[in-house]
Curated annotation (Swiss-Prot):
Membrane topology field: Multi-pass membrane protein
Comment field (misc): Heme 1 (or BL or b562) is low-potential and absorbs at about 562 nm, and heme 2 (or BH or b566) is high-potential and absorbs at about 566 nm.
GO molecular function, one term: metal ion binding
Residue stretches spanning the membrane: 33-53, 77-98, 113-133, 178-198, 226-246, 288-308, 320-340, 347-367
Gene3D superfamilies: Cytochrome Bc1 Complex, Chain C
Keyword Aminoacyl-tRNA synthetase: no
Keyword terms, alphabetized: Electron transport, Heme, Iron, Membrane, Metal-binding, Mitochondrion, Mitochondrion inner membrane, Respiratory chain, Transmembrane, Transmembrane helix, Transport, Ubiquinone
Gene: MT-CYB
Protein source organism: Tamandua tetradactyla
Name of the featured protein: Cytochrome b
Binding positions (heme b b562): H83, H182
Amino acid sequence: MTHIRKTHPLFKIINQSFIDLPTPSNISAWWNFGSLLGVCLVIQTLTGLFLAMHYTSDTITAFSSVTHICRDVNYGWLIRYIHANGASMFFMCLYLHVGRGLYYGSYLYLETWNIGVILLLATMATAFMGYVLPWGQMSFWGATVITNLLSAIPYIGTDLVEWIWGGFSVDKATLTRFFAFHFILPFIITALAMTHLLFLHETGSNNPLGLSSDMDKIPFHPYYTIKDILGLLIMIATLVTLVLFSPDLLGDPDNYTPANPLSTPPHIKPEWYFLFAYAILRSIPNKLGGVVALVCSILVLMIMPLLHTAKQRSMMFRPLSQLLFRLLVANLLILTWIGGQPVEHPFIIIGQVASISYFSIILILMPLAGILENHLMKL
């Protein structure tokens, strides 16, 4: 008798996606991050739901409600810190997942890649709005600075900012709508993630060689379910260690001070996972130019398929491209460091050089390396 998982309309979909899915036999641990991101999304949605039960989105009580969660709610401190540090794990996995895609040429699956970039943008928007909710100093000033960037848009900028604020400054209306969006976006992200998987399963997974693996596929379960559980255990262990030993390691001390519109913090900066983009924004003296560079730093991923000049898909056998990829990673780490530094010499010039090299590596050097490697293959 055919197993129920192959005949039942609902189980059949799950079976084709996670159990009998034909998977390349040679995919490495770098292919683990998709499932880890799924787990992160579930963790964030559940902890967020429990936090929302006790949180109030009002400027007067928001900060107090977060304090109340940590002090009075059963394991509220644990839920809050899992949620806060879970976001860091989410972005760590996201960046490694995107890096894997760049290194192994996964961006040539156009639909999957483009939905992935939209997912990245949606996650960044969600995280930004979530950071505003505790209504600490960095929440308030971060919201003020980042939303104010939209005023650089010609003609409609000022009206657009006031429309987003719901008034003439970041206030109760802003906090309420940010809470509403922060609540709804994860469900949109879940729908996008399903679409991402749908398109991925149309083509099948890429593999480290970048070659077709149709002649050598194995079922996802038990091989990759077991393999993914190892990555999951490592991630959970890291998250639990972070939450229980140093929950505020990645946070900002300024956010333990209630929001005060009359007192600006000495250094306004976002969470660590946005620092690279923040450094690019600050490296351009012109406001509109900075905003354009900020948006392009993420949207440049959309045009990666157009910049692929090599005859080989993966970078596995392309030493020049490998070198440039490693330079790009180092460059992003430098940008992350600069984003957290004050705007003064020598950090300004380092940020400008790193920003120029970021775009140069992606837009100029990598395509040139691909062309050069094509010629080297003929020798």
